[in-house]
Every structure is written in C-alpha cells, then in structure tokens.
Amino acid sequence: ATMLSKVSPNWHIDMFERLEGAGIESSNENNNAGTGHAALCELNYTVEQDDGSIDASKAQEINEQFELSRQFWGNLVKNGDISNPEEFIQPLPHISFVMGPTNVNFLRKRYETLRTIPMFDNIEYTEDMETMRKWMPLMMENREPGHQMAASKIDEGTDVNYGALTRKLAHYLEQKSNVSLKYNH
C-alpha cells in the first residue's frame, strides 16, 4: 500500500486487516525472526546440485530483493515519510553454523561459491573452534572439540523488526487522504 500510494497518488487505496492494528501477527517482532531475509545465512537459498556444485541463483535473487526493500525504506526515511530507522533496522552479522561431515562439506562449498559473487564476496568461513567461539560465544559455550563443525559469517547483515516497520508504514498511510486502513475487518 505504501508503494502504491507513492507511485499512484491519485488512486484510492483500501487496506483491510483482520486484527485491531497493524503489525500484530505475522510481522510482529515476537513472531518473526527478523534476519532481513537477505540470503546471507539462510542455507535453503543455496542448493547443492546432483554434480555437487552449489546453485546460488536463488540467493542472488533474494539478496537483490532485500536490497531493493532497503532502498525503498531508505527513501521513505530520506523523504521524512517514516522516521527513526534504528527502531526497525540494525546492523547485525549473519552466521550459519553446521555440524557433521556432510553439512560441513556443504557449507564449505557454499562459501566457495558465494565468495565469487560480488554481493557475497565478504563472506568468511571457518572450521576453527576458537574462531567460532569469537563469532558466537554463547552457542559455543561448553561445546567440546571432537565434532566436525563449521560456520560462515557476513558482517553486513541486518536485523529487521518487521513489526515496528509495519506499524511505521501503517502510521504513514493513516496520514494519506487517499488511503483508508480498515482494522477488525
């Protein structure tokens, strides 16, 4: 609705929500992981092919979509349509962690593939226990050597509070004369 109100300001937009407000259910911060869904740590966006290679095309597509979202949100902030972006987006490293030889081999191949793609070229990879302790101290606490483990990390990840973002976007829309938000519908 926000994008439509921008590109077609003469349209009248009715937005319906079953609940009593915006950002209460699926986008609420208690119900959404908030990783930004930029394909930095979500392993399911990189698929191992029958020949053992890694197909990263879905990861590239997802990352491009997320970057477009960030640009859109940045434009809304720049134009004063929404404020205080720190309330809905924070920088946060994205880490993938795996255990077992099959998973470690997959993560290593994923790393080798992603680091050749400009949008992922800052990815780091380790099988070193001490490095993993630095990257994720709570997760590695009391973990004993002897199990094959690996991790990858991209420092430029984000944490998105989709509940806060949704409420900000709804507040913006409530100020628009061509938009009608209908709650409890």
Q: Where are the regions that the model predicts?
A:
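Short hydrophobic segments within beta-strands
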Residues: F16, F97-V98, D155
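FAD-binding beta-loop-beta segment adjacent to the flavin cofactor pocket
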Residues: S27-N31, L138-N142
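Dinucleotide-binding Rossmann-like beta1-alpha1 core, especially the glycine-rich loop
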Residues: A33-K134
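Short, intrinsically disordered, charge-balanced linker/junction segments flanking boundaries
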Residues: A1, H12, A22, S180-H185
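Short, hydrophobic/amphipathic alpha-helical packing segments
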Residues: A1, F66-G74, T166-A170
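Active-site-adjacent bridging/hinge elements
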Residues: H12-D14, M140-G146
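Glycine-rich FAD pyrophosphate-binding loop
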Residues: S5-E29
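Helical element adjacent to the flavin cofactor pocket in flavoenzyme catalytic cores
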Residues: H147-H185
